Amino acid sequence: MTVSLVKYDGTPDSIRRAVELCNGFENLGKNHRVLIKPNNCFRHNTMPPYGMVTTTTVVEAVVQLLLEHGCRDISIGEGAIINIFDELDPYTKHGFRGTGLDRVARKHGVKLVDLNRGPFREVDLGGISVRVAREAMKADFLINLPVLKTHFQTKVSLGFKNLKGCLSPDSKKRFHTSKRLDRLISLLNDAVRSDLVLIDGIYMLEKGPETLAGKAYRKDLIIAGRDVFECDVVGATILGVDPAEIDYLSEFAGRHRRSFDLAAIGTVGEELESLKEQLEWRFEPDQELLGPTKITGLSAPHPGQTLCSACGATLALALSMLGKDNPETDFGG
């Protein structure tokens, strides 16, 4: 297959060209049940959205293309992290409102689906039972819309990892507590197939996945393809991360005999070499969140892969607020 690389010019035409160059709608029927899965995992006013969540203009452009194609059964689905601010307000809906996806849905007559609420289907991933939203499993055509960002646990968070949003909340936690995060991400992409992947690279994020410690850079790039492995290999390469060193991609490549050879994958549009960056994915809470505040006597070690996104966001917010309210404080007693 082919991965398209298109510079974003601020109009829907960029998205259209990216889809056309990779023949993204080749297998899409007008009567297909379509699910758009953006990365809208969390949204809060203290966290700038740039590089963290899928840009609303990209989602809307995809909706418009689907309607032009003749599709009418279109849903936008996400399962955001547990709401750590107000348990009475489902956080997925909070995210839809915060990013304007609720407005897009009303404007174009498409459905919004909270994947956290199920119903779910039990799926076995290498001996570990997880629950996947039935909405994702029954879709005839799944459009995977991740962001071009790094991740302090998995090096990158692109198409493969974006499908974690299709899991039930308890299954998301199980991915981390099982101590097999990368393998489970790999296996999940066998159970839930992406028919089109479109990586939103309008911004790219260093030291992700959130923007309290992470830094967003304007990139104005759209990456599109019909093979999630190829798109993630190209996306990781652009971020400056060796895709062969990403464990869930290596797991998948070994199981399916896939190659990391970029020449074999093939790209069209912009020249890949000219797009390469060197972003840092490593993130140490001690240095990034406590260091600038000159707080002493307190330690926040790297949690490894055992911390889920909800807990990670909570930790980042808590440390950020602690540092803001207690600069240069010695907690050592």
Identify what each model region corresponds to.
Residues 1-333:
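N-terminal and secondary-structure boundary signal
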